[in-house]
C-alpha cells in the first residue's frame, strides 16, 4: 500500500475520533491552547527583569503554532518511502496516540466530575458535597508548564530532550529557572497560612462527610421505622461533629510544625504553580510556622548558638536548635551562624569582581533593563541584591560624586514636592546623575526644613556629649533622634571636631617648651573662633557625601577657614599667662620682664634702702617671694612685693607704677631649649650639650608638664575670677601647684593698677552706707549721746577682765618657752599674706624682740573620728553652760562679735627689764571679719637670709596690730588700706603712715591704729584699764571680751576666749594679747568709743588734746560706682535702688541683693551648721517666756517662738530692717546652696583627693598627679608646725569655753577640715564647670 495513502487514512481516522469525542469543538488543540493562556499568571508573578525573557518564548511559540496550523511544511511531502521511514513514523504516531489517550482519560474524568456536580445540585440536599481529594480536576494541571518552542504540526509535541539536557539531568544540575530564589511577600505568607488551615480542615472533615454520605444512602434504602430513626440519630451526631470541626480556632487547625499536608495541591491550586511544593514545605517548616520564634536574636542567644554548634561540630542543626531551647528552627540556627561566621562573611568587592560585573552588565543589559538574576549566576558568592547595590551605588558610570550644585538641589526639592519624601526611586530620575541614596541623604541631612544650620551653642554641645556617653560613638542616627534640629552627619562632624580639638590641645601642650607656655585670653578666643569656623565649615560641606573621605576633606578645608571675630567673655580676661623663666632671669628676680623700669626700681631701692626712705622691696621680702607658697592666696604671686609700697605718695611719682597702669600683654616667643635649660642664661658654651640633653629628656616630661599646665590654668581661672567678690583672702593648703615666684599673671598687673590707684576710705564708707541703707543721722545722734555719758559706767565691765588678765599673764609667763616670738621680718612676711575673712574674733599677737625658735618637725597627727568630735562637742557645751551660770550680770551693754585689739609695749633689748608706765589693755568690740596691720619693730628691714623657720610659708589667718615706732613701716593690703580710718572711731591722730615716712604722730599716740571695720548698726567699744604689773613678760594673755546672752530677765555677760591658731608656733592655752602704754589721763579718754560706719563727720581728739582736721562725711562725698562693677553706671544705679531686691512688706524700702562672696558663704554655712542649736535656744526662749518653767524644746515650741517674734516685732523697724539686710545678703548664697552642680559631690568627704566619677578623664589624671603634690605640701607644713590648729576655731568656740591646750589641738579640728574641704569643693565645682565648657 502506498505510504501516502496510509498516512492520509490515519489522519482521517484521527479526525473522526476527534469529532466523535468532541462534537461541539473544532479540535483538541483549541482546548490545550486555551488552557495554556493560564501561563500568563506565571509570567505575571515573575519579576520585572525576567518578564521580557519569559514573554519572548511565548510569543515565538504562539507564532510557530499558528504557522504550523495554517500551512504544512513542504519538506514533509518529500519524505523517502522506505521501511526505515515507516518505522520512525510509526514510533511518532505511537507517542501521539499515547498522549491523546492520556488527554482523553483526563477529559473523561473531568466529565464524570461535572456530571456528579450537576447531579448533586439537582438533588437539592443541604449536606456538604463529598469530594475525593485524590481526584483533582485535570484543568488545574494543564498549561502550568512552558510548552516547547518547537512542536509537531499535527500533535503539538515538541522534540525530545537533547544531549545537553540529558547530561545535566544525569549530573543533577538544575535548570536556570530552578536557581531563581524570590523573596516571600506578605500576601504570599498570608496565603500559605490560609492554605494550611484549609487543608487541615479538609483532612478533618473528609471522614465525617463520607460517613454522613453513607448514612444518607443507607437511610434511603431502609424501610422500617426503627432503623430509619436510628440512622437519623447517627446523622445528627455526624452533623454535630462536622459543626464542631468547623468551629475550631485557626491556631488549632495549624497543627504541628512537621505535620503532613498536601503540598502539591497547595502549590498548584492555592499558589497556581508560582511556588513549588518542596519550596512551600521547607518555608513552612523552617520559618513560617507559628511555633517558630521570629524575634530578633539577642547577643546572649548568638553566643550560646556558637558554643552549642561548636560542641556538635557545626553539624546536626536540628539537635542544636533543640538544645538551644528558644523555639528556633534548625534552618534559622544555620542561617544565623552563617551570618556571624567570619569565614563565611561577605568580603569587600575586589577589582576583578567589579570588572566582571561591569562586563556582564554591558553584555546582558537590554536598554535600561539589567537582568541581575541571570548575572548573579556567573558571580560566585554574590546575590542579586549585592549586584544591584554595587552597580547603582558605585560602578554606574553615569553617577556623579562630590558637592551638589544649586541646580541639583532645586531639582531635588521639586521632585520631593512632587512625589513625597519616600519614593526615592522615582525622585532619582528627576535628578540625573544621582542615586536614590544620594537624593535621600542630601534631602534628609541638608535640605530638610527642620534642620538647624550654623554654629553649635554650648547647650547643644553639652547634649551631644551626654548622648555620646549614653549611646556610644557610632549610633549617630539614634543620637540625632534625641538632639532636635540636628542630623546624624552633623553630630558625627561635630564630634570629630571636638575630638580633634582636644587632641590638638593635648599635642600642643606636649610639644610646647617647658617654660614658654602661655595661657591667655587670646589663646582661648582663637580656639573658640577656630571651633566656630570648623563647625560652620564642616556643616556647610560635610553632608554632600556619606563617605568618610569627603568628610575628612571637608574637615581639612575647615581648618584653613579664617576664624570669625566675636566678643570674648569677661572671664577670659582673667586667664593667667606664663612667663619665660630665662627672660625673667635676665631682667631680674621678682620683677616684670616687660617693664625693666620696675626691675631697676626694685633692685636699686633694695640696695640703697638704708640711704633713702623710699618704699622698696627688701632682701627679706625678695626671699619671701622665692619661698614656695602653700596657700591658695588670691593675691597674685608676681606682685606681692608691691603690697609694701602702694600707700605711699612716692608710688604715684614712680615711673614704674605708671608703666604698670599702662601694662599690656605681649605675645611671648618660645625660646630655644639651650637658653632655657642652662642655669646661667648667658652661658652659651654648653648650648649643644644642653640642647641634646633637653631633647633626650623631653618626651619623658610631657605628661607631667601637661598635667601641671592644665591644673594651673583651671585653678588660676577660678581664683582670679572670684577676686572681685571675695576680696583678698587666704585659702587652705589643698592642691597648691608650685611655680617660680617670678611668674607673672595678668591678674597681677590688674591688681598693681588697682593698688597704685590709692583709694581713700570715704568712698568705701559711702558705698557700704548706701548698700546697707544705714541711717547716718541716727548713728550720729547715738554717737553724741554715748560721748556725753560719764566714764564711770566703765567700771562694772572691767571687774571681770582684770582677774583674767592676771591669770593670762601668769600662764604666759609659764608658757613662754612654748611660744616662739616673731621678729619684725616674720611679721612683715605675715603681713604680706592676707588673712582669711572670718566671722569671729580678731586676735592680736605680741612681738617681743627675741630670736625665732625653730618649730620641731614631725608627722601630721591623725584626724579625729566622729565619736571623738561628738565627745568634744558635748564637753564644749557643758563648759559653756557652766560658764554661763557662773558669770554675773555686770552690765547692760550689748556687744556683738567681739574682737580683741591690744597694743604692745615698745620692744626692748633682750634681757633688759621692763621700765615704763603701767600697761593697760584696750578691748575693742567690733562686729565683722578681722583685718591685719603689721609693722616692723626696727627702723629698717634687715637684708640677708632667712632662717629655716622663715622659709616655711606662713598661713596667717588673723591680724597683728603693733604700735608704730620710729622708723616703722606699715604694710597693709590694698583691700583694707582702702578702708582708711575715718574720724569718729578710735582716735588715731590721722591716717596710717606710709612706707618711707617716719610716723612722728604715731609715736605720740597711746592707742593702736585700728582699721575701720564696717557693719550695719553701731557697735560699742569698751576700754578696760589694767593696773601695772611689774615683772610681767611682754607676751601676755589677752583679756576676754564680753559677750551678751539674752535671757528672760536681762542680759548675761559671758567671757568668750579668742582662740586663734598660729601656723608657725604652738598655741598657748589662751590667745596672746598685746600691751600698750598707759593712757595719759583717764579723764581725757572717753569711756565709750563709738565706732559706727556713719560716724565719720565727728572731730576726734588725740591723746594730747590736739585738734585733728575733720574728714568730709559720706553724705558730702560722691559715691564711686566703679567700686561695685565695671558695667554701665545706669545698670549699677538701677541695682542700687533695689527695684527687684529684698523687700519686707511693712517696710517701704527695698535693698538690693548682694552678690555671693566668701564671707557671706561662710556665714551661711556657719548658720546652717548651728541651725539646730539656734532652733533649740529659740524654742527654749519661747517656752520659758510662755510658761516660766524649764525650756522644753519639743515639737511646736519652735513654731511658738516664731509666732512670738512675729507678734512682738511685727512693727519694729529695726527688726524689719535687720530682716531685709539678712535677705539681701544671704538670698543668693542660699539659692546657690540649693543648686548642686552636676557630678560634683555636695557633701564633705574626708578624702580631699577624691574626684567625681563624671569628671573627664584628663581631670582624673590631673587629680591623681596632684594627690602626691598635696601630700608633699602637707608633710612640709606638718614638719614646720606639727601642732598648728586652724584659726577657724576662733569663731566656733562656745561661750564660756576655755581655749584648748597644746595637747588638745594636736589633731586638726574637724571644723577646720570641713572648712578647708568646703573651699576645695568650691574650687572643684568651678573647675568642673570650666572643663565642661
Swiss-Prot record:
DNA-binding region range list: 317-341, 424-447, 476-499
Subcellular location: Nucleus
Gene Ontology BP annotations: snRNA transcription by RNA polymerase II; snRNA transcription by RNA polymerase III
Residue ranges of the region described as SNAPC5-binding: 84-133
Coiled coil (residue ranges): none
Keywords from the UniProt entry: DNA-binding, Nucleus, Phosphoprotein, Repeat, Transcription, Transcription regulation
Domain Myb-like intervals: 250-288, 344-395
Modified residues (Phosphoserine): 68, 1252, 1254, 1301, 1309
Name of one Pfam family that matches: Myb_DNA-bind_6
GO molecular-function term, one example from the UniProt record: DNA binding
Chain intervals with Low complexity compositional bias: 516-546
Domain HTH myb-type positions: 289-343, 396-451, 452-503
Function according to Swiss-Prot or TrEMBL: Part of the SNAPc complex required for the transcription of both RNA polymerase II and III small-nuclear RNA genes. Binds to the proximal sequence element (PSE), a non-TATA-box basal promoter element common to these 2 types of genes. Recruits TBP and BRF2 to the U6 snRNA TATA box.
Quaternary structure and interacting proteins, as annotated: Part of the SNAPc composed of 5 subunits: SNAPC1, SNAPC2, SNAPC3, SNAPC4 and SNAPC5. SNAPC4 interacts with SNAPC1, SNAPC2, SNAPC5, BRF2 and TBP.
Name of this protein: snRNA-activating protein complex subunit 4
Name of the encoding gene: Snapc4
Amino acid at each position: 500500500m502506498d505510504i501516502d495513502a496510509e498516512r492520509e487514512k490515519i489522519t482521517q481516522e484521527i479526525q473522526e475520533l476527534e469529532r466523535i469525542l468532541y462534537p461541539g469543538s473544532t479540535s483538541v488543540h483549541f482546548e490545550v491552547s486555551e488552557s495554556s493562556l493560564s501561563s500568563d499568571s506565571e509570567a505575571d508573578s515573575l519579576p520585572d527583569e525576567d518578564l521580557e525573557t519569559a514573554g519572548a518564548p511565548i510569543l515565538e511559540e504562539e507564532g510557530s503554532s499558528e504557522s504550523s496550523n495554517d500551512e504544512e511544511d513542504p519538506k514533509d511531502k518529500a519524505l523517502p518511502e522506505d521501511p526505515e521511514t515507516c518505522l520512525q513514523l510509526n514510533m511518532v504516531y505511537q507517542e501521539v496516540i499515547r498522549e491523546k489517550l492520556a488527554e482523553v482519560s483526563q477529559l473523561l474524568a473531568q466529565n464524570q466530575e461535572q456530571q456528579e456536580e450537576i447531579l448533586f445540585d439537582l438533588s437539592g440536599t443541604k449536606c456538604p458535597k463529598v469530594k475525593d481529594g485524590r481526584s483533582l480536576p485535570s484543568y488545574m494541571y494543564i498549561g502550568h508548564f512552558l510548552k516547547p518552542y518547537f512542536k509537531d504540526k499535527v500533535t503539538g509535541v515538541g522534540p525530545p530532550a537533547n544531549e545537553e539536557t540529558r547530561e545535566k539531568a544525569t549530573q543533577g544540575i538544575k535548570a536556570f529557572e530552578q536557581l531563581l530564589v524570590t523573596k516571600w511577600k506578605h500576601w504570599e505568607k498570608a496565603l500559605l497560612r490560609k492554605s494550611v488551615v484549609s487543608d487541615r480542615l479538609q483532612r478533618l472533615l473528609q471522614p465525617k462527610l463520607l460517613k454522613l454520605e453513607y448514612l444518607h444512602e443507607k437511610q434511603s434504602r431502609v424501610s422500617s421505622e426503627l432503623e430509619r430513626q436510628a440512622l437519623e440519630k447517627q446523622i445528627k451526631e455526624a452533623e454535630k461533629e462536622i459543626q464542631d470541626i468547623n468551629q475550631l480556632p485557626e491556631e488549632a487547625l495549624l497543627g504541628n510544625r512537621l505535620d503532613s499536608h498536601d503540598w502539591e495541591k497547595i502549590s498548584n491550586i492555592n499558589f497556581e504553580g508560582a511556588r513549588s511544593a518542596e519550596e512551600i514545605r521547607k518555608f513552612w517548616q523552617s520559618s513560617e510556622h507559628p511555633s517558630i520564634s521570629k524575634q530578633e536574636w539577642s547577643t546572649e542567644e548568638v553566643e550560646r548558638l556558637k558554643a552549642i554548634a561548636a560542641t556538635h561540630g557545626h553539624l546536626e542543626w536540628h539537635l542544636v536548635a533543640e538544645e538551644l531551647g528558644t523555639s528556633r528552627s534548625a534552618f534559622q540556627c544555620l542561617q544565623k551562624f552563617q551570618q556571624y561566621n567570619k569565614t563565611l562573611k561577605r568580603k569587600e568587592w575586589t577589582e576583578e569582581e567589579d570588572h566582571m560585573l561591569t562586563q556582564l552588565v554591558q553584555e546582558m543589559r537590554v536598554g535600561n533593563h539589567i537582568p541581575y538574576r541571570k548575572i548573579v549566576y556567573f558571580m560566585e558568592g554574590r546575590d542579586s541584591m549585592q549586584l544591584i547595590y554595587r552597580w547603582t551605588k558605585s560602578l554606574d558610570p553615569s553617577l556623579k560624586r562630590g558637592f551638589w550644585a544649586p541646580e541639583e538641589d532645586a531639582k531635588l526639592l521639586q521632585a520631593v514636592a512632587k512625589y513625597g519624601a519616600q519614593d526615592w526611586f522615582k525622585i532619582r530620575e528627576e535628578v540625573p546623575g544621582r542615586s536614590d541614596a544620594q537624593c535621600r541623604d542630601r534631602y534628609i541631612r541638608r535640605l530638610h526644613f527642620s534642620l538647624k544650620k550654623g554654629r553649635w551653642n554650648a547647650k547643644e554641645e553639652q547634649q551631644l556629649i551626654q548622648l555620646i556617653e549614653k549611646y556610644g560613638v557610632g549610633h549617630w542616627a539614634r543620637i540625632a533622634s534625641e538632639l532636635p534640629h540636628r542630623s546624624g552627619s552633623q553630630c558625627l562632624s561635630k564630634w570629630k571636631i571636638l575630638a580633634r580639638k582636644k587632641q590638638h590641645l593635648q599635642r600642643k601642650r606636649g610639644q610646647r617648651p617647658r617654660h614658654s607656655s602661655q595661657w591667655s585670653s587670646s589663646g582661648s578666643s582663637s580656639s573658640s573662633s577656630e571651633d566656630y569656623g570648623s563647625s560652620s565649615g564642616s556643616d556647610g560641606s560635610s553632608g554632600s557625601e556619606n563617605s568618610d573621605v569627603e568628610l575628612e576633606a571637608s574637615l581639612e578645608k575647615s581648618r584653613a577657614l579664617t576664624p570669625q571675630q566675636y566678643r570674648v567673655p569677661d572671664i577670659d580676661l582673667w586667664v593667667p599667662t606664663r612667663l619665660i623663666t630665662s627672660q625673667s632671669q635676665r631682667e631680674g628676680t621678682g620683677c616684670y620682664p616687660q617693664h625693666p623700669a620696675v626691675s631697676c626700681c626694685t633692685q636699686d631701692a633694695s640696695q640703697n634702702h638704708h640711704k633713702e626712705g623710699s618704699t622698696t622691696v627688701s632682701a627679706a621680702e625678695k626671699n619671701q617671694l622665692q619661698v614656695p607658697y602653700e596657700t591658695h592666696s588670691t593675691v597674685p604671686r608676681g606682685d606681692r612685693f608691691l603690697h609694701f609700697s602702694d600707700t605711699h605718695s612716692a608710688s604715684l611719682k614712680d615711673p614704674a607704677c605708671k608703666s604698670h597702669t599702662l601694662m599690656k600683654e605681649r605675645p611671648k616667643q618660645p625660646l630655644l631649649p639651650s637658653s632655657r635649660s642652662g642655669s646661667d642664661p648667658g652661658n652659651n658654651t654648653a648650648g649643644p650639650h644642653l640642647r641634646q640633653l633637653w631633647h633626650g629628656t623631653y618626651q619623658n616630661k610631657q605628661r607631667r608638664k601637661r598635667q601641671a599646665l592644665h591644673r594651673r590654668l583651671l585653678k588660676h581661672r577660678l581664683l582670679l575670677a572670684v577676686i572681685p567678690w571675695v576680696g583678698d583672702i587666704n585659702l587652705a593648703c589643698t592642691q597648691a601647684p608650685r611655680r617660680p615666684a617670678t611668674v607673672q599673671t595678668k591678674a597681677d598687673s590688674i591688681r598693681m593698677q588697682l593698688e597704685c590707684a590709692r583709694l581713700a576710705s570715704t568712698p568705701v564708707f559711702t558705698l557700704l552706707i548706701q548698700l546697707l541703707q544705714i541711717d547716718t543721722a541716727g548713728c550720729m545722734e547715738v554717737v553724741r549721746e554715748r560721748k556725753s555719758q560719764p566714764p564711770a559706767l566703765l567700771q562694772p565691765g572691767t571687774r571681770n577682765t582684770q582677774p583674767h588678765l592676771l591669770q593670762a599673764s601668769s600662764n604666759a609667763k609659764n608658757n613662754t618657752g612654748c611660744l616662739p616670738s616673731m621678729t619684725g621680718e616674720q611679721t612683715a612676711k605675715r603681713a604680706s599674706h592676707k588673712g582669711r575673712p572670718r566671722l569671729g574674733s580678731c586676735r592680736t599677737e605680741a612681738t617681743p624682740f627675741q630670736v625665732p625658735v625653730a618649730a620641731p618637725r614631725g608627722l601630721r597627727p591623725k584626724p579625729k573620728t566622729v565619736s571623738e568630735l561628738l565627745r568634744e562637742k558635748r564637753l564644749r557645751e557643758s563648759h559653756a553652760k557652766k560658764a554661763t551660770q557662773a558669770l554675773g550680770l555686770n552690765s547692760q551693754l550689748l556687744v556683738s562679735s567681739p574682737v580683741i585689739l591690744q597694743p604692745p609695749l615698745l620692744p626692748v633689748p633682750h634681757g633688759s627689764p621692763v621700765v615704763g608706765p603701767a600697761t593697760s589693755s584696750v578691748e575693742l568690740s567690733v562686729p565683722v571679719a578681722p583685718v591685719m596691720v603689721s609693722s616692723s619693730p626696727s627702723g629698717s628691714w634687715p637684708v640677708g637670709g632667712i632662717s629655716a623657720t622663715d622659709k616655711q610659708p606662713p598661713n596667717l589667718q588673723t591680724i597683728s596690730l603693733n604700735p608704730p615706732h620710729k622708723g616703722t613701716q606699715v604694710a597693709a593690703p590694698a583691700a583694707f588700706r582702702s578702708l582708711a580710718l575715718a574720724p569718729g572711731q578710735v582716735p588715731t591722730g590721722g591716717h596710717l603712715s606710709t612706707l618711707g615716712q617716719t610716723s612722728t604722730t604715731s609715736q605720740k599716740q597711746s592707742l593702736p591704729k585700728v582699721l575701720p571695720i564696717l557693719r550695719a548698726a553701731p557697735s560699742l567699744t569698751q576700754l578696760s584699764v589694767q593696773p601695772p604689773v611689774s615683772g610681767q613678760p611682754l607676751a601676755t594673755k589677752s583679756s576676754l571680751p564680753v559677750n551678751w546672752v539674752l535671757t528672760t530677765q536681762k542680759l548675761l555677760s559671758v567671757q568668750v576666749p579668742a582662740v586663734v591658731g598660729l601656723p608657725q608656733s604652738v598655741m598657748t592655752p589662751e590667745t596672746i594679747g598685746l600691751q600698750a602704754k598707759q593712757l595719759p589721763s583717764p579723764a581725757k579718754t572717753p569711756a565709750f568709743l563709738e565706732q559706727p560706719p556713719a560716724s565719720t563727720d565727728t572731730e576726734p581728739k588725740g591723746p594730747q588734746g590736739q585738734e585733728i582736721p575733720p574728714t568730709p562725711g559720706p553724705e558730702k562725698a560722691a559715691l564711686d560706682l566703679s567700686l561695685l562693677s565695671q558695667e554701665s553706671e545706669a545698670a549699677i544705679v538701677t541695682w542700687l535702688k533695689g527695684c527687684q531686691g529684698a523687700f519686707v512688706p511693712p517696710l517701704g524700702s527695698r535693698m538690693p541683693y548682694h552678690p555671693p562672696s566668701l564671707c557671706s558663704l561662710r556665714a551661711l554655712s556657719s548658720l546652717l551648721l548651728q541651725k539646730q542649736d539656734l532652733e533649740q535656744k529659740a524654742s527654749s526662749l519661747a517656752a520659758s517666756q510662755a510658761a516660766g518653767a524649764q525650756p522644753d524644746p519639743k515639737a511646736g515650741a519652735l513654731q511658738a517662738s516664731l509666732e512670738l517674734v512675729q507678734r512682738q516685732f511685727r512693727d519694729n523697724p529695726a527688726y524689719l530692717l535687720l530682716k531685709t539686710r539678712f535677705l539681701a545678703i544671704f538670698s543668693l548664697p542660699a539659692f546657690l546652696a540649693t543648686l548642686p552642680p552636676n557630678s560634683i559631690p555636695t557633701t564633705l568627704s574626708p578624702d580631699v583627693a577624691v574626684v567625681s566619677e563624671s569628671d573627664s578623664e584628663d581631670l582624673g589624671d590631673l587629680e591623681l598627679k596632684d594627690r602626691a603634690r598635696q601630700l608633699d605640701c602637707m608633710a612640709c607644713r606638718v614638719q614646720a608646725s606639727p601642732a598648728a590648729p586652724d584659726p577657724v576655731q576662733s569663731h566656733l568656740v562656745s561661750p564660756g569655753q576655755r581655749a584648748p591646750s597644746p595637747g588638745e589641738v594636736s589633731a586638726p579640728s574637724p571644723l577646720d577640715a570641713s572648712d578647708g574641704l568646703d573651699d576645695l569643693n568650691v574650687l572643684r565645682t568651678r573647675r568642673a564647670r570650666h572643663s565642661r565648657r
